[in-house]
From Swiss-Prot:
Cystine residue pairs: 190-204
Subunit comment: Heteropentamer, formed by a combination of alpha (GABRA1-6), beta (GABRB1-3), gamma (GABRG1-3), delta (GABRD), epsilon (GABRE), rho (GABRR1-3), pi (GABRP) and theta (GABRQ) chains, each subunit exhibiting distinct physiological and pharmacological properties. Interacts with GABARAP. Interacts with KIF21B. Identified in a complex of 720 kDa composed of LHFPL4, NLGN2, GABRA1, GABRB2, GABRG2 and GABRB3. Interacts with LHFPL4. Interacts with SHISA7; interaction leads to the regulation of GABA(A) receptor trafficking, channel deactivation kinetics and pharmacology.
Gene Ontology molecular-function annotations: benzodiazepine receptor activity; chloride channel activity; GABA-A receptor activity; GABA-gated chloride ion channel activity; transmitter-gated monoatomic ion channel activity involved in regulation of postsynaptic membrane potential
Impact noted for substituting residue 343 to L: In DEE74; does not affect protein abundance; decreases cell surface expression; decreases current amplitude in response to GABA; does not affect zinc sensitivity; accelerates activation and prolonges deactivation and
Region of interest (Interaction with GABARAP), residue spans: 433-450
Lineage, top ranks: Eukaryota, Metazoa, Chordata, Craniata, Vertebrata
Keyword Glycoprotein part of the UniProt annotation: yes
Known glycosylation sites: 52, 129, 247
Signal peptide: 1-39
Protein name in the entry: Gamma-aminobutyric acid receptor subunit gamma-2
Known catalytic reactions: chloride(in) = chloride(out)
Post-translational events: Palmitoylated by ZDHHC3/GODZ; required for the accumulation of GABA(A) receptors at the postsynaptic membrane of inhibitory GABAergic synapses.
Gene: GABRG2
Swiss-Prot/TrEMBL keywords: Cell membrane, Cell projection, Chloride, Chloride channel, Cytoplasmic vesicle, Disease variant, Disulfide bond, Epilepsy, Glycoprotein, Ion channel, Ion transport, Lipoprotein, Membrane, Palmitate, Postsynaptic cell membrane, Signal, Synapse, Transmembrane, Transmembrane helix, Transport
Protein's GO biological process: adult behavior; cellular response to histamine; chloride transmembrane transport; gamma-aminobutyric acid signaling pathway; inhibitory synapse assembly; post-embryonic development; synaptic transmission, GABAergic
Length: 475
């Protein structure tokens, strides 16, 4: 009896399928622990983009592909020729973002504006076939392709921003669409109409067009119906308030052709706070101050004269200061009218006292009184019949020594000018008070001129202010 073959039995055991599967698992497990056999891609083969905390992997475009595309596009490209030359006009879509406006210089009639200006057009010579949809380029490519010769027609001075690099951007799409944007600071002309100053409103334009291409070559269109503006709270308008804007398109005919002109109008309204404090209130107070002389005794010549001269000189100074913030226009502004009328009121108050002082100081004794003083009999038998004053005491107003002057009228009278007939012209003298020609006329008493002025001057000034403010603010 032969002994059992142990090795052959073991060999049959190890050759079973179960053993083979176990060995395969162990081998794969050992290989996975070795780092050299792990399959990983380099981080440089992908670019990561974060969007709402979701990571999207996109293949990175080799720089060599962009260089090849640009070289192919610029090969044989002539940047001196516009797209579709000789075929059809080039259509330029324009857009604008207003970063800030101000300040407005009324003396030079100009304003400063900071904008981002964008132009879009199609150039079939710049089409390319690639998986790249758009080429995002910097300002170095601007001079290598055709760019519209757009200029700002009412610009006095324009500066492009160059810090830290030129603020220009260029985009080229694979279908030939080109986007060109740049940042500009422009000092633009604005013809201010100052008839209603300082209650004026203005529409300051910003106009641009092609410099050399008429509308048969280039046509401009607005990309959007309205121009976008930034935060108006940071604008340095100072004396003005921003009301709104509007954009228009028009054709301007010149000797060199018809050009499409694009315009943006910025509506501005002037704030009156500064001028109310600096001009209107001081002028009004000076006019009121000139009326104080009507309550000062007419015999106080130095007081009334110095007050009148001081108010006149002050009004002259105020009118000069008010004009400094304006250009030297040939027409009368609303402020000029107000200051001039105030000056007339102040000057009239001074003239009123001069007139009063002249006639009061040049009174002559009446002829009847002279006869009475010379003839004792007439002085003896001349007496007045007793009279009773039936007027209420409240109706008797004694102002500025008027009652005292009435008592002295018996001793002093007024004579007409030499060589004049009192019955043939209107005069203010006492001797002219009687006569048929005086019937229905108003007799003015020199002694009561201050009383009349106390009523006339304030009433006239209030009526002027009513008409002035209603006309300029509501009409």
């Amino acid at each position: 009896m032969s002994s059992p073959n142990i090795w052959s039995t073991g060999s049959s055991v190890y050759s079973t399928p179960v053993f083979s599967q176990k060995m395969t698992v162990w081998i794969l497990l050992l290989l996975s622990l070795y780092p050299g056999f792990t399959s990983q891609k380099s981080d440089d083969d992908y670019e990561d983009y974060a969007s709402n905390k979701t990571w999207v992997l996109t293949p990175k475009v080799p720089e060599g592909d962009v260089t090849v595309i640009l070289n192919n596009l610029l090969e044989g490209y002539d940047n001196k020729l516009r797209p579709d030359i000789g075929v059809k006009p080039t259509l330029i879509h324009t857009d604008m973002y207003v970063n800030s406006i101000g300040p407005v210089n009324a003396i030079n009639m100009e304003y400063t504006i900071d904008i981002f200006f964008a132009q879009t057009w199609y150039d079939r010579r710049l089409k390319f076939n690639s998986t790249i949809k758009v080429l995002r380029l910097n300002s170095n490519m601007v001079g290598k392709i055709w760019i519209p010769d757009t200029f700002f027609r009412n610009s006095k001075k324009a500066d492009a921003h160059w810090i830290t690099t030129p603020n220009r951007m260029l985009r080229i799409w694979n279908d030939g669409r080109v986007l060109y944007t740049l940042r500009l600071t422009i000092d633009a002309e604005c013809q201010l109409q100052l008839h209603n100053f300082p209650m004026d409103e203005h529409s300051c334009p910003l106009e641009f067009s092609s410099y050399g291409y008429p509308r048969e070559e280039i046509v401009y269109q607005w990309k959007r119906s309205s121009v976008e503006v930034g935060d108006t709270r940071s604008w340095r308008l100072y004396q003005f308030s921003f009301v709104g804007l509007r954009n228009t398109t028009e054709v301007v005919k010149t000797t060199s052709g018809d050009y499409v002109v694009m315009s943006v109008y910025f509506d501005l309204s002037r704030r009156m706070g500064y001028f109310t404090i600096q001009t209107y209130i001081p002028c009004t107070l000076i006019v009121v101050l000139s009326w104080v002389s009507f309550w000062i005794n007419k015999d106080a010549v130095p007081a009334r004269t110095s007050l009148g001269i001081t108010t006149v000189l002050t009004m002259t100074t105020l009118s000069t200061i008010a004009r400094k913030s304006l250009p030297k226009v040939s027409y009368v502004t609303a402020m000029d009218l107000f200051v001039s009328v105030c000056f007339i009121f102040v000057f009239s108050a001074l003239v009123e006292y001069g007139t009063l002082h002249y006639f009061v100081s040049n009174r002559k004794p009446s002829k009847d009184k002279d006869k009475k003083k010379k003839n004792p009999l007439l002085r003896m038998f001349s007496f007045k019949a007793p009279t009773i004053d039936i007027r209420p005491r409240s109706a008797t107003i004694q102002m500025n020594n008027a009652t005292h002057l009435q008592e002295r009228d018996e001793e002093y009278g007024y004579e007409c000018l030499d060589g004049k007939d009192c019955a043939s012209f209107f005069c203010c003298f006492e001797d002219c008070r009687t006569g048929a020609w005086r019937h229905g006329r108003i007799h003015i008493r020199i002694a009561k001129m201050d009383s009349y002025a106390r009523i006339f001057f304030p009433t006239a000034f209030c009526l002027f202010n009513l008409v002035y403010w209603v006309s300029y603010l509501y009409l």
